[in-house]
Amino acid sequence: MEKILIILFIAIVYTHAGFAVKSYREIRNEGVVRQNYEESCGAAAVATLLNLLDMHQFSESDIVSKMSSNTNMVSFLELSKVLHDLGWENKGYQISREVFEKLNIPVLVKIQNDPRYPHFVVVINQIGDFISVFDPNFGKYISSKDEFYSIWDKDNLGGYVLIVNPKNKFMPSHKLNLPTNKSIFDK
């Protein structure tokens, strides 16, 4: 019996897992600022985008406090102004699927399952047929491009994106030369 206890003790002492086990919920929420209010997806998406681009970590309340009005039916223009106030160069565009395919940085997009309720998420275009989606309401997930296009560019006329020019020196490969043509704010 003594030998069994010694072996059991040694087994317990030396069987330390070198990794942390995470739940599906933890994995899904990793890297995503979740929205705390029904219509605060814009603020949470901006915080998520900035956290992906910078070492500084923003919260949803940091962004909401910079907004000039409440979070009800926030527009790309208001999100752009908040980003500008925080010192980030940005511009909104309506772009085609072909242009979207060339993007390799996180961008904020407006998606619509129901035209009455637009929703803002952050997406990263991946090589192949998939897109990483950082949704303030649901969390992080992978979507096929066809599924994404069905809620971003339903009519094949182009979808709306807000492109933020990274200023972090750790991401020089993602520095963009934003086009000088008309943005959606110039209409």
Which residue ranges define each predicted feature?
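Positively charged n-region of N-terminal signal peptides that target proteins for export
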Residues: 1-4
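Active-site-adjacent structural segments surrounding the nucleophilic cysteine of cysteine proteases
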Residues: 9-66, 183-187
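Short alpha-helix boundary/capping motifs
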Residues: 31, 72-73
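Residues that form or flank phosphate/diphosphate-binding pockets in enzymes
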Residues: 41, 74, 118, 143
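Sec-exported extracytoplasmic/periplasmic mature domains
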Residues: 46, 50-55, 68-72, 84-88, ...
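Active-site-adjacent substructure of cysteine-protease-like catalytic cores
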Residues: 64, 71, 80-136, 140
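Noncatalytic regulatory segments and standalone regulatory/sensor domains
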Residues: 126-187
